[in-house]
Curated annotation (Swiss-Prot):
A lipid is attached at C20 (N-palmitoyl cysteine). This is FAD:protein FMN transferase. The lineage of its organism: Bacteria, Pseudomonadati, Pseudomonadota, Gammaproteobacteria, Enterobacterales. Its main location: membrane. One of its GO terms (cellular component) is plasma membrane. It comes from Salmonella typhimurium (strain LT2 / SGSC1412 / ATCC 700720).
Length: 350
């Protein structure tokens, strides 16, 4: 069995968004910018900051890593003692106390899930694990229909709710085996959280990324808007499809072309359709979303990726989203963008 995963290569200054939610690459050097980086949530984080010295940068590096470690402890499905996994391990159907951050993340995810007709489903964890993209080991054979049905029976957004009681936040499930997986929005939340840290530190010019989710404010070291390149879905890591000015927004890309494995002679995508219980097999290979927050962009790109081209376009038009799609067509690719996305577009390489 052959496994191929996303790997990030980081350079400096203007970040390159790569599919399957991996960490971005930079495209040009910028000696006036302090570039900090590290690891979190099984991926890479990167922060480019203008206007601070090396001493301040070293202090900021520590604060960033500490905050991201706390975010990972909150959201991880790989740490058995994380806040999320304690909820998952519990079979109690009573309201479960959680932090305000956890409640906000789940609320946003449930909202996007409803607007994508359940395609963005944070309860799909049993299916993700069954297909080998969670903490469990990869299967030796394609799961049987019975195994898929058994896993699907443990999923469903209707089985999870967020409760606010006099300012205290709770999650409640009505299935004891419900398993919540927030990896589809975790990177976006962490990127937004880093942006808030920059604001708290009085930093007005920054670009932050966690995996494939980014957020920015102000101008880069050259006094120009932060620009992000969307990669072509090929094996060439520096092949650029489009360039956008995210203008203080969040951006995230989801793709099916790098995070996969081969099993029984078939390519198995990490993107699981909650309706079928199986990895997606349609021709939509990359979705980029620009939204007010990186968390929203991170959630929307997953849901749209699951839906496939036609259904995703219907949702994009209905919700007025800024979206760029790349579809496989024969031996090549074709692209589509919403009118809202065009307002951010600097260059399209078609």
């Amino acid at each position: 069995m052959k496994m191929t995963f996303c790997r990030a290569v980081c350079l400096a200054a203007a970040f390159l968004l790569m599919g399957c939610d991996e960490a971005p690459e930079t495209t040009t050097a910028s000696p006036a910018a302090q570039v900090l980086e590290g690891k979190t949530m099984g991926t890479l984080w990167r922060v480019s900051v203008v206007g601070i010295d090396a001493k301040r940068a070293a202090e900021l590096q520590t604060k960033i890593q500490t905050q991201l470690d706390a975010d990972d402890w909150l959201l991880s499905t790989y740490k058995n003692d994380s806040a999320l996994m304690r909820f998952n391990h519990s079979r109690s159907l009573a309201p479960w106390p959680v932090s305000e951050a956890m409640a906000d993340i789940v609320t946003s995810a449930l909202r996007i899930g409803a607007k994508t007709d359940g395609a963005m489903d944070i309860t799909v964890g049993p299916l993700v694990n069954l297909w080998g993209f969670g903490p469990d080991r990869q299967p030796l054979h394609i799961p049987t229909p019975a195994q898929i049905d058994a896993a699907k029976a443990k999923t469903g957004l209707q089985h999870l709710q967020v409760i606010d009681r006099a300012g205290h936040q709770f999650l409640q499930k009505d299935l004891p085996d419900l398993y919540v997986d927030l990896s589809t929005v975790g990177e976006g939340y962490a990127a937004d959280h880093l942006a808030r840290l920059m604001e708290q530190e009085g930093i007005a010019r920054y670009l932050v990324s966690v995996g494939g989710a980014l957020s920015s404010r102000g101008m880069n070291a050259q006094g120009q808007p932060w620009r992000v390149a969307i990669q072509k879905p090929t094996d060439r890591e520096n092949a650029v499809q489009a360039i956008v000015d995210i203008n203080g927004h969040g951006i995230s890309t989801s793709g099916s072309y790098r995070n996969y494995y081969e099993l029984d002679g078939k390519r198995v995508s990490h993107v699981i359709d909650p309706q079928t219980g199986r990895p997606i097999e349609h021709n939509l290979v990359s979705v980029t979303v620009i939204a007010p927050t990186a968390l929203e962009a991170d959630g929307w790109d997953t849901g749209l990726m699951v839906l496939g081209t036609q259904k995703a376009q219907e949702v994009v038009r209905r919700e007025g989203l800024a979206v760029f799609m790349i579809m496989k067509e024969g031996e090549g690719f074709k692209t589509w963008m919403s009118p809202q996305f065009k307002t951010f577009l600097v260059s399209d390489k078609n």
